[in-house]
């Protein structure tokens, strides 16, 4: 069991239930899934770059990524429909909690010139999205074996009904929001 999952059940649920006046514990917002996405536009010219991105994402998440393909052709970007242009992973359950714990405690503090994450990155329905400029902030990535520094998108999907509830949920886990 991940420590944050136990912490959520033991303390965060009762804290949020009192704060927002929920009648049932099932109304309390929870983290549903965490999606990691890595776009590799350069994969059009060099297929090896996509393989390296897949390997990096697999190391970070502990799960085999799905290779994403272009939905439609765009002449300006020189891509055709069906070309592999990135990879993504959806984490749920135990792996999600373990990743979330590593993200907060290990990875985010290793970001260069870190001053906190923006609280404006909520989508209006309590889901939070953030971008990471370099994958080397994760301890699973061996710095010497990295061929190219890549960024990735991290989306935390919650059952919160609005941004206020979503922010309260993440703040209860000591999520490092900018003051």
Curated annotation (Swiss-Prot):
* Family matches, as Pfam families: Ribosomal_L5, Ribosomal_L5_C
Query: Which SUPFAM superfamilies does the UniProt entry name for this protein?
Result: RL5-like
GO MF annotation terms:
RNA binding; rRNA binding; structural constituent of ribosome; tRNA binding
- A single GO BP: translation
- Protein keywords: Ribonucleoprotein, Ribosomal protein, RNA-binding, rRNA-binding, tRNA-binding
InterPro entries found in the cross-reference section: Ribosomal_uL5 (IPR002132), Ribosomal_uL5_bac-type (IPR020930), Ribosomal_uL5_C (IPR031309), Ribosomal_uL5_CS (IPR020929), Ribosomal_uL5_dom_sf (IPR022803), Ribosomal_uL5_N (IPR031310)
- Organism superkingdom: Bacteria
Q: Which GO terms describe its cellular component?
A: cytosolic large ribosomal subunit
Is Transport one of the keywords UniProt gives this record?
Answer: no
Q: How does it assemble?
A: Part of the 50S ribosomal subunit; part of the 5S rRNA/L5/L18/L25 subcomplex. Contacts the 5S rRNA and the P site tRNA. Forms a bridge to the 30S subunit in the 70S ribosome.
Q: Which PANTHER family match?
A: 60S RIBOSOMAL PROTEIN L11-RELATED
- What's its job? This is one of the proteins that bind and probably mediate the attachment of the 5S RNA into the large ribosomal subunit, where it forms part of the central protuberance. In the 70S ribosome it contacts protein S13 of the 30S subunit (bridge B1b), connecting the 2 subunits; this bridge is implicated in subunit movement. Contacts the P site tRNA; the 5S rRNA and some of its associated proteins might help stabilize positioning of ribosome-bound tRNAs.
Name the HAMAP family for this protein.
Ribosomal_uL5_B (MF_01333_B)
Instruction: Provide the family line.
Output: Belongs to the universal ribosomal protein uL5 family.
Q: Can you name this protein?
A: Large ribosomal subunit protein uL5
Query: Which gene underlies this protein?
Result: rplE
